[in-house]
């Protein structure tokens, strides 16, 4: 099983530009001396992770989770988990539950300790603020900063202009405050159909930043909400909800990926108008952008991932080939390895592509120190030791972990008939081949030195069994074991005692490092050999593996007992990653 220990080269406090910003704010006392509604002092650093519950989180979200929760931890602050649940058509409690589970699995908590020593949860939903958001929208209308537009979505898009042409003002832009208020209230009352009206901010239709050309703040959507039911038929847009939620929760540093950089002026515009109306007061939260995580040989588009699931090109959202967090967890990745990966990737201001080998290297480095060892024969060939007594067996032993003697030894039997890897025998070996061939001696790892004496073949000339004799005084760990020198060492399991297991060999899901770049059809890049299911023979103790126990199968790589399909006494194993980097091949 796995043995917990943090990866030694993890550096959660690595310097980045966001830490520099926070350090400057702390030095200037920007957020010092604040209090919550109960008069309790607020931390000087409060971040948040605000996913929309419309899908499963993927490896790209892990970077944001580690960043937001990690900064809050390192600066003695807190991080909120907030669900941006403003689009009832796409959201579901299934996704809410999966996100909560994923953040917990990564090792983070949104609880803080109250003055009475009790944990204070900081789990929020944008829908918690629907009443306040509506009231704040009316405030903007009363200030002449928002209006109800009766154009269609197509007309609004057509009149927005482009980078070289200014937008055209809506013919409804100059409605009176009274008319706008009445229309907005009628929208809430359900008097209009979807798309009949929207509420827009009144900013500048000639703004160089197209985001600022009277963006939509509210739209009509007659849809059942997973938390508020049918109470609302109008819903706020992300840009309106996001900044207000931050302010209501006393967020200090609102961290977003780079695609939201052009939205930052709107973030500030909404909060400044509400501050000037007396709703909020300084210091307001501030938005900062960082580069998103782009991983080679993967896609993270929710729409495209859903297509893979819907078309049954993968075995669900938790398929071990998927980049979803439920997928990489089932693959056998550890939370610590993902945190290590995020630390190694770092935080930058410009988008870049991260090679898959960086992720797999982090997994490999983490598991090397924690995974118990075991022996597995994946492509079996029978080996018969002719001079070993029939019906007899003896114990061999090996360390549970070669660098952790305190974990003790594992014991497994050796008998007359063994399984070895087919690639460890070659009847006509090439130069430099030191494993088993007729007349050659090798060591059975943890066992005896043997000499190959012959082979059995089927009618087609295929080798179906190898014969050998063993040298009795050469057993590993006994006096004189090294009296016979050999160059080759092979692994094995006793045929009579081995655990016959289903093993799934996973590889990259795509053959193309950028499967959906440049207008490609990402489906064309699917790797037809990304999953192979085999029957393997394992040392008998592995039969007791529990779901999510991780092992290094010696000479093969790292494997995990599948968390979904394993049953007591019958674990199914997934290959997590090989022993060496395979991405440069």
UniProtKB/Swiss-Prot annotation:
Binding site for L-glutamine: 84, 238
Example GO molecular function: ATP binding
Catalysis performed (reactions): tRNA(Gln) + L-glutamine + ATP = L-glutaminyl-tRNA(Gln) + AMP + diphosphate
Residues that bind ATP: 52-54, 58-64, 257, 292-293
Motif mapping: 'KMSKS' region: 299-303
Domain of life: Bacteria
Motif ('HIGH' region): 51-61
Localization (cell): Cytoplasm
GO CC terms, sorted: cytosol
Primary location: cytoplasm
Keyword terms of this UniProt record: Aminoacyl-tRNA synthetase, ATP-binding, Cytoplasm, Ligase, Nucleotide-binding, Protein biosynthesis
Family matches, as InterPro entries: aa-tRNA-synth_I_CS, Gln-tRNA-synth, Gln/Glu-tRNA_Ligase, Gln_tRNA_ligase_bac, Glu/Gln-tRNA-synth, Glu/Gln-tRNA-synth_Ib_cat-dom, Glu/Gln-tRNA-synth_Ib_codon-bd, Glu_tRNA_lig_a-bdl
UniProt entry tagged with the keyword Nucleotide-binding: yes
UniProt KW NADP keyword: no
Self-association state and partner proteins as the record states: Monomer.
Similarity annotation: Belongs to the class-I aminoacyl-tRNA synthetase family.
Protein name (database record): Glutamine--tRNA ligase
Natural source organism: Cupriavidus taiwanensis (strain DSM 17343 / BCRC 17206 / CCUG 44338 / CIP 107171 / LMG 19424 / R1) (Ralstonia taiwanensis (strain LMG 19424))
Name of the gene this protein is made from: glnS
